[in-house]
């Protein structure tokens, strides 16, 4: 049995969709709960994660609960609700990307017939097929399986085999974006039939281009030929990275000791409701992004001044990642539709991007979510005018945290910060790479046992075995 939850910004819309869906039911074989609008008579449009949680709980007496959402923060509220639910209930829940009205009606009919959760989702996702056919539009199945447009006589293409050991991660992808942006041509990058625009470093990353993958550039326009030549030269140069046949041999790192210090970045308070105009909020966001881009230029220069070219390339890549027109466009759309603050819109957009990275199955690319979180934090600091200063240490210290941003690690003094020990994190994150380059001991993914450590307790990190020892 599958029950449904409808999540909408508008109470009237949510109830209306629910009313339509119940017309499809001939029995109580599918329960429907509504979580729509917020309890504020003056500003009733919005979503509430607690409401979503309670709605799910009210229909959790089924094998699965399918959550249908309209847009924007409805998805974020649903994801937050999953974190609030008891694990045994959360395990039953699936979130559906289908259109709210047609998808809910199709899901209701399917669930009422006794279909399993996968069939219900399939029917919801294909709910627009009848309308497409009536309007003479191509099937969505065709679009999903072949997202690249058909070649025409003017379009040229060139395929290369990627020889970068870690694929097209942030640094080589940023080199690709920068290089192709200089040509007057319409371009697409294609891998296995899926196309993205080379203007967006984030779209390129989500293609998950790995070592030995074939990547094709399709170009059309006055400078198409020049773009293809530059693309080939980039590939031959491994997109600016040194070609390595095998992973580099890590230098042996001796155990490091110090006093435990729990580190947490400053928390930025994000208000959803805005008292400003949309244009004023857009200006605030652009200014905060500009300030963050200046921060990244400073970090790049700091690394270059220390002869750390690989680290400088990381923050140069961050600059490209942040300066992505699609991110600003998505945030501007939220500002238009939800009349929210710039920080709320930006948080929504970058959290969604961070989650997309976390869902990748390539460990190296997956770890880039930490870079996105770093950029979000830095921008929120500027938007909320929050003062942030790193703690100063006078004796050997081991930093303890759930995770730590790359920009934070670069600003640490390795003379006193001897090691970093995380409950989460990733051994292939840029934070880990920077720590190793600076000679700071690094262990991660230690889980809850990390929090048994007392502040000021003496710790020794064994980097080789990825374990810590408490010395009282």
Curated annotation (Swiss-Prot):
Pfam families: EIIA-man (PF03610), PEP-utilisers_N (PF05524), PEP-utilizers (PF00391), PTS-HPr (PF00381). Its EC number is 2.7.1.121. Residues 1-135 form the PTS EIIA type-4 domain. One of its GO terms (cellular component) is membrane. Transmembrane segments: none annotated. Gene3D superfamilies: HPr-like, Phosphohistidine domain, Phosphotransferase system, mannose-type IIA component, PtsI, HPr-binding domain. CDD domains: PTS-HPr_like. Pathway: Polyol metabolism; glycerol degradation. The active site is at 9 (tele-phosphohistidine intermediate), 169 (pros-phosphohistidine intermediate), 430 (tele-phosphohistidine intermediate). Residues 264-472 are annotated as: PTS EI-like, N-terminal part. Component of the dihydroxyacetone kinase complex, which is responsible for the phosphoenolpyruvate (PEP)-dependent phosphorylation of dihydroxyacetone. DhaM serves as the phosphoryl donor. Is phosphorylated by phosphoenolpyruvate in an EI- and HPr-dependent reaction, and a phosphorelay system on histidine residues finally leads to phosphoryl transfer to DhaL and dihydroxyacetone. PANTHER family: PEP-DEPENDENT DIHYDROXYACETONE KINASE, PHOSPHORYL DONOR SUBUNIT DHAM. This is PEP-dependent dihydroxyacetone kinase, phosphoryl donor subunit DhaM. It comes from Escherichia coli (strain K12). The gene is dhaM.
């Amino acid at each position: 049995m599958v029950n449904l939850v409808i999540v909408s910004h508008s109470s009237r819309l949510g109830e209306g969709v629910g009313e339509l869906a119940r017309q499809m039911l001939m029995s109580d074989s599918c329960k429907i709960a509504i979580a729509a609008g917020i309890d504020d008579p003056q500003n009733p449009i919005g979503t509430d994660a607690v409401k979503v949680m309670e709605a799910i709980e009210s229909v959790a007496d089924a094998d699965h609960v399918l959550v249908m959402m309209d847009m924007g923060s409805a998805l974020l509220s649903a994801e937050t609700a999953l974190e609030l639910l008891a694990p045994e209930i959360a395990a039953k829940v699936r979130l559906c990307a289908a259109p709210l009205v047609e998808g809910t009606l199709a899901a209701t009919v399917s669930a009422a017939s006794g279909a399993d959760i996968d069939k219900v989702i399939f029917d919801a996702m294909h709910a627009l097929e009848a309308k497409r056919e009536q309007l003479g539009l191509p099937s969505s199945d065709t679009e999903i399986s072949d997202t690249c447009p058909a070649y025409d006589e003017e379009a040229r293409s060139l395929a290369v085999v990627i020889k970068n050991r870690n694929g097209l991660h942030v640094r080589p992808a940023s080199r690709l974006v920068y290089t192709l942006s200089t040509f007057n041509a319409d371009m697409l990058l294609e891998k296995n039939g899926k196309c993205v625009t080379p203007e967006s470093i984030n779209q390129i990353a989500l293609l998950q281009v790995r070592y030995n993958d074939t990547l094709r550039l399709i170009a059309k326009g006055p400078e198409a030929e020049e773009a293809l030549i530059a693309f080939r030269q980039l590939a031959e140069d491994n997109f600016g990275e040194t070609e390595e046949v095998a992973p580099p041999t890590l230098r042996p790192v001796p155990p490091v000791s110090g006093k435990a210090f729990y580190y947490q970045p400053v928390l930025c308070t994000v208000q959803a409701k805005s008292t400003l105009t949309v244009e004023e909020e857009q200006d605030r966001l652009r200014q905060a992004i500009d300030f963050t881009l200046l921060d990244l230029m400073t970090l790049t220069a700091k690394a270059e001044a220390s002869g750390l070219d690989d680290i400088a390339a990381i923050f140069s890549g961050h600059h490209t990642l942040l300066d992505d027109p699609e991110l600003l466009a998505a945030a501007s759309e939220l500002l238009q539709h939800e009349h929210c603050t710039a920080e709320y819109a930006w948080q929504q957009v970058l959290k969604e991007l961070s989650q997309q990275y976390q869902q990748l199955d390539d460990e190296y690319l997956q770890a880039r979510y930490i870079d996105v979180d770093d950029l979000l934090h830095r921008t929120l600091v500027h938007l909320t005018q929050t003062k942030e200063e790193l703690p100063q240490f006078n004796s050997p210290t081991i930093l303890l945290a759930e995770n730590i941003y790359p920009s934070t690690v670069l600003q640490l003094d390795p003379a006193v910060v001897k090691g970093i020990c995380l409950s989460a994190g990733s051994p292939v994150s840029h934070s880990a790479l920077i720590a190793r380059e600076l000679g700071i001991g690094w262990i991660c993914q230690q889980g809850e046992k990390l929090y048994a450590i007392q502040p000021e307790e003496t710790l020794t990190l064994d980097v080789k075995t990825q374990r810590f020892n408490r010395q009282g």
